[in-house]
């Protein structure tokens, strides 16, 4: 990995994404699942589909305690996991998140 890249890998983990998995959020959950968590779990940590589904559903359950989920995320989570497995998508880098979704970035930095 080049020095100028912002993703900091420790084995098969990225610390800021691990922090996200431990941090329930009340908004931007769909973006977090599609652009960060599904690609991270499938293509970086390389957990199984079922394990990734359980991890994300557990995280969403904690998020739902802050603010009820607006919709049934089950289909969206399953689609995101299958899409990432098929296409090899990588999670957004933290710096890319800063430009694409500043609100989510700020939630993670606080």
Region spans (language model):
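Basic, alpha-helical nucleic-acid-binding regions used in initiation and control of genome expression
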Residues: 1-34, 40-110
């Amino acid at each position: 990995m080049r020095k100028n890249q912002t993703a900091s890998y420790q084995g098969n983990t990225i610390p800021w994404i691990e922090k996200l998995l431990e941090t329930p959020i009340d908004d931007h959950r769909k973006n977090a699942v599609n652009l960060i968590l599904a690609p991270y779990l499938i293509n970086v940590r390389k957990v199984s589909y079922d394990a990734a589904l359980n991890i994300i559903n557990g995280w969403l359950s904690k998020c739902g305690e802050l603010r009820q989920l607006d919709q049934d995320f089950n289909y969206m989570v399953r689609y995101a996991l299958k899409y990432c497995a098929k296409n090899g998508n990588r999670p957004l880098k933290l710096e890319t998140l800063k430009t694409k979704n500043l609100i989510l970035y700020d939630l993670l930095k606080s």
